[in-house]
Amino acid sequence: MIPDLEKDYLYFTRVVKRDLGLDLTLYKETQMKRRILSFIVKKKYITFGEFFKHLKKDALLLDEFISLITINVSAFFRNRNRWDVLEKQVIPRLLEDSRGKLRVWSAACSSGEEPYSLAIMMERSVGTRHYDILATDLEPAILKRAVIGEYQSRQMEELNEQERRSAFIEKGDTYQILPEYRKAIRFRRHDLLTDYYEKGFDLIVCRNVLIYFTAEGKHQAYQKFADSLRRGGVLFIGGSEQILNPADYGLATLNNFFYIKT
């Protein structure tokens, strides 16, 4: 066993939070510690302290580290039946209460499949210029991929033929989302655990991310999401997630995986 790695982890989480603004203690410790230890050994550092010194000086190493601690699993219209509920039941309800553009936030958007799915759906349900989508993620490299919006054919499996034809241009063995959809989305770096949350959203989509947070991390995120919704706004979460006491956050269950701000 390489000396000091285990006992230095607590110190490492403190200095990473203090100097880099990343709170690792709000992620599940066993999983996070295992991933970071593996990364440190791979990079041939002896202690967390040595690794941290290089982390502060090396921008590329920091980008790698951020990529390591973020979860980048995404797909177009993931769990399609839930998206059908969103389009046929939730969006019409939001439109009834809306006074202008629908404000939508795709939180932890990864490489862009989720916000582009939202844009495709909004285009046919709401129409051009009647919605605004903010898409955020912690990892700069993954956001760059999202902005480009280029995907392999295997990533397009959940899209039907009409969606492929209307929203993408084929480029050899890849597909790129059309410029009008890219322009409809504001991509920005954001840390769900530490950064400020914008207010007044009609819809917030954050799916299959908070399962990696501790109970305290989830509590903080759900409260901030609730505060960011307008009254009557909706939070859409993943199929492996559940808010056990939504009333604690001023929310009520609207449908499976959909919560409305009361």
Curated annotation (Swiss-Prot):
Identification of the protein by name: Chemotaxis protein methyltransferase
Assigned EC number: 2.1.1.80
Catalysed reaction equations from the record: L-glutamyl-[protein] + S-adenosyl-L-methionine = [protein]-L-glutamate 5-O-methyl ester + S-adenosyl-L-homocysteine
Keyword entries, A-Z: Methyltransferase, S-adenosyl-L-methionine, Transferase
PROSITE patterns (alphabetical): CHER (PS50123)
A GO molecular-function annotation: protein-glutamate O-methyltransferase activity
Organism of provenance: Listeria innocua serovar 6a (strain ATCC BAA-680 / CLIP 11262)
Role noted for this protein: Methylation of the membrane-bound methyl-accepting chemotaxis proteins (MCP) to form gamma-glutamyl methyl ester residues in MCP.
Keyword Ribosomal protein annotated: no
Superkingdom, taxonomy of origin: Bacteria
Family annotation (SUPFAM superfamilies): Chemotaxis receptor methyltransferase CheR, N-terminal domain, S-adenosyl-L-methionine-dependent methyltransferases
Family annotation (Pfam families): CheR (PF01739), CheR_N (PF03705)
GO biological process: methylation
Disulfide bonds: none
Residues covered by the CheR-type methyltransferase domain: 1-262
Residue numbers binding S-adenosyl-L-methionine: 72, 74, 78, 114, 137, 191-192, 207-208
